[in-house]
Amino acid sequence: MSTPIEFKSSNSVTKDDHLYTKFTYENSVVEKDANGKFIVTPTASDYEFKVDLKVPKVGLLLVGIGGNNGTTLLGATLANKHNISFENKEGVVKPNYYGSVTQASTVKIGVDKETGEDVYVPFNSIVPMVNPNDLVVDGWDISGLPLDQAMKRAKVLDVTLQKQLYPYLENKKPLESIYYPDFIALNQSERANNVFNQVNGEVKTDNKWADVEKIRKDIRDFKAKNELDKVIILWTANTERYADVLPNVNDTADNLIKSIKESHEEIAPSTVFAVASILEKVPYINGSPQNTFVPGVIELAEKYDSFIGGDDFKSGQTKIKSVLAQFLVDAGIKPLSIASYNHLGNNDGYNLSSPKQFRSKEISKQSVVDDIIESNELLYNKESGDKVDHCIVIKYLPAVGDSKVAMDEYYSELMLGGHNKISIHNVCEDSLLATPLIIDLVVATEFATRVQVKGPGKSDYDELYPVASLLSYWLKAPLARPGFKPINGLNKQRQQLVNLLSVLVGLPIDNELRFERILK
C-alpha cells in the first residue's frame, strides 16, 4: 500500500466526489518580423478543471484477444488479481506489472521539508485510477481457439504459470470477428475460423454496415451483461495494409458512413471497429500501425465527441530511438543515418512478412524522429542536409518465437568532420513489453474521460479533445490534433502526462529550476 497523500493547495477544492482546480496556463508566442527577427511574447490563460474522482467499473474489449498480446494481458491481470506466483529456474516469481508506467513507475510531488531531497510517489496515487485487476476483459478474434489454448499457442508465459491460469480461461472462446482477407496477409487465412461475415464457408464483404451494427451490438451486450459503467476497445490484432485515402470515400465523416453502407473495398476491419466504437461513444485505441484513423474517422470522432487514440504500440526499439535520437540532437550531435533491423517469430512477424503489411509498420517506425530533426535547424538545414537516412528491416524467423531481436546503428557527425557510431543489440520478449502498454493506454484513457475543462471565456465544462494525444508516450506514430504535428520525444511525452496530473491536483509544474541549490 502506498502512503496516503493530501494536497493542500489554494488552487483546488474537493466537492461531491469531484476535484475542482484553477490553473493559469503560461506559454510564449513567437512571431518573425520582416527582418527575420523573432518576437517572443509571454502569454497566460486561465483554465478550470473538473475531475470525477469516482473510479467506474470498466470493461475492456480487445480486438485480437486470442493473440500473443491478448492472452498475455489476460494472464497478467488474472495472475495479479488472484496473486498467483510461480516458480522458474531462478526461483519464485510473484505477479507484478513491471513495464507499466501507471502501475510500476513513480513521479516527483515535491521536496522533503527537512532534507530538500526529491519525494516520489506511485504514478497511480496522484488521482484515482482504475486498477487493472478490476478490468472485465473480453474481445473478438478471427481464431476460435479457446483462450487457454490460445495462451499455450502464444508461448509467451511460463508453463507453470499457464497451468495455474487455465481454469480461469478454459472453454472461454473469443467473440466472432470480422475478416476481410485483402487487409491482412494471406497466411492468416488458416486462423480465420471464427468470423461472423462468413456464410457457408464463404467470406462476405458486401455488407460492411451490418458488420458495424454487429460490433455495436456486441459492445452493448458486453456492457449490459457485466453491468459496466464504461467500455474501452483496443485493437491488438494483425497489422493491416494501408487503406487508400480517397475523395468521396473516407475523407469526411459523411462520406465514410456512406462508403461503409456501400461496402467500399477501402473500408478496413479496424475502421469498422473504430466507427462502431465512436457511434457507441466508446473510446477506441489502435495498437497497430495501419491508418485506421482516416480523415473521415477523425471527423466522426469529433462529431460524436468520442475518444480515439493511436497508432502502434511503442515498446522496444522505437521507444529507445525516441530517447536516443532526442539525446543526440539535444547534445548538438547530428545523426546522419539510423539503420534498424528486427527479426521475430511470433504471429505478428508472420503477418508482417507480407509486403503490404510490412509497409504499414515501416511508415509507423520511420516517423518517430521527424519532429526531433525539425527542432534543430543548426544541424538540419538545406545547406548541410535536412534529412536522416533511415531504413527499417523486419524479418520473420519462427525459431525465436516471441523473443524479438532488434539491432540498430546510429551513425552521427561530430565536430570538424568527426564521426560516431552507436550500435545497439536488444533482445526482448515482445508481448511482455507490449502488454503493460495496453494496461497503461486503458488506464490513462479511462482517466481522461473523467477530466473536464472550462477554458477562457467559457461558462460550461467540456470534455477533453477527442483525439487523445495524451497517449503519445505509448505509441509509435501518435495521433495529433489536425493542424498540429505529433510530438515523438519520449521525455516530452511523459512530462506532459506528469504535468497534467500536477495541474489537476493544484501542484506547480515541476520546472527543475531548483533555486534552493543554485542561489545564495
UniProtKB/Swiss-Prot annotation:
Disruption phenotype: Inositol auxotrophy. Virulence is not affected in a mouse model of disseminated infection. Simultaneous disruption of ITR1 results in lethality. InterPro entries: Myo-inos-1-P_Synthase, Myo-inos-1-P_Synthase_GAPDH, NAD(P)-bd_dom_sf. Keywords: Cytoplasm, Inositol biosynthesis, Isomerase, Lipid biosynthesis, Lipid metabolism, NAD, Phospholipid biosynthesis, Phospholipid metabolism. It is found in: Cytoplasm. It comes from the Eukaryota. NAD(+) binds at residues 66-69, 141, 177-178, 188, 191, 236-239, 287-288, 312, 315, 346-348, 361, 401-402, 430-431. Gene3D superfamilies: NAD(P)-binding Rossmann-like Domain. Its EC number is 5.5.1.4. Its cofactor is NAD(+). Pathway: Polyol metabolism; myo-inositol biosynthesis; myo-inositol from D-glucose 6-phosphate: step 1/2. Its main location: cytoplasm. Pfam families: Inos-1-P_synth (PF01658), NAD_binding_5 (PF07994). One of its GO terms (biological process) is phospholipid biosynthetic process. GO terms for cellular component: cell surface; cytoplasm; hyphal cell wall. It catalyses: D-glucose 6-phosphate = 1D-myo-inositol 3-phosphate. One of its GO terms (molecular function) is inositol-3-phosphate synthase activity. Homotetramer. Belongs to the myo-inositol 1-phosphate synthase family. PANTHER family: MYO-INOSITOL-1 PHOSPHATE SYNTHASE (PTHR11510). Key enzyme in myo-inositol biosynthesis pathway that catalyzes the conversion of glucose 6-phosphate to 1-myo-inositol 1-phosphate in a NAD-dependent manner. Rate-limiting enzyme in the synthesis of all inositol-containing compounds. This is Inositol-3-phosphate synthase. It comes from Candida albicans (strain SC5314 / ATCC MYA-2876) (Yeast).
